[in-house]
């Protein structure tokens, strides 16, 4: 049987975090507990991963979330490469893990795997729920500093969040929409998974500002489509048939292509505002199918998140602000 941090913790009757602190020679472990854990490590023949068993190299883990659109995966990896070119390679190394789903169980499995490797910092984009918050708490107790990007968990023990000002992004989208339609018109709002704070807050900003601009509280329909083409297509087609005064669609997340296909051939004028300048959004913006793109620096979020941990762990530079916002910009057809 190959022993892991989890099995050592079970045998010693302590948490995984305690085992990690012992393995990494960190404080806050009583002499008795440290001796017991070290004895079990010796008895079981447990070996820490050879890549991180010696020297003073600090390992930072990056968990790449699973997206339907590879644009976001590629943008995340681009941010990792940007950071890799700037970090002090003699002091810091990066370990990247890609997810195959958005299941909480996979997040936890990858966190455990990276903890096993001895990471001192972790960058991740995850849903805002108690399961992930509890995992971040365990990582914190193990001495691992966590920085979130894109979607925050503000009530967790993460040390910092790097992302778009989501409320502002939604408000910008509402302002653009209000310039294209009448307050008497209906708006369809398509979002992904409301468990992700990035999806939830952006929609809140959009709807709140629409009401401030004179639109009624009942002017919209909301569809949670999990960034799936089929669900988005059906939601748009259904809204077109049910709401004769539907003249605006806000795509708070993907799939923009499904929205474009659903409104193809529609006789009425349709204003479409989307987030993120994906290849599909760029093509549809050029064609005039969509009107505005509210863009965020996705690669920059990952880059900055890694660099926050780099500065903290390699040089002891404390995090000054709990939230760092990247720039938000508006893209029109004329800018392409």
Where are these regions (language model features)?
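N-terminal helix-turn-helix DNA-binding module of bacterial transcription factors
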Residues: 1-56
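Amphipathic helical "hinge" segments at domain boundaries
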Residues: 48-109
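Hinge/beta->alpha junction and helix N-cap segments in small-molecule ligand-binding domains
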Residues: 65-71, 95-106, 128, 162-172, ...
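Flexible loop/hinge segments that line or gate small-molecule binding clefts
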Residues: 129-168, 278-290
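Hinge/cleft segment of the Venus flytrap/periplasmic-binding protein
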Residues: 210, 297-336
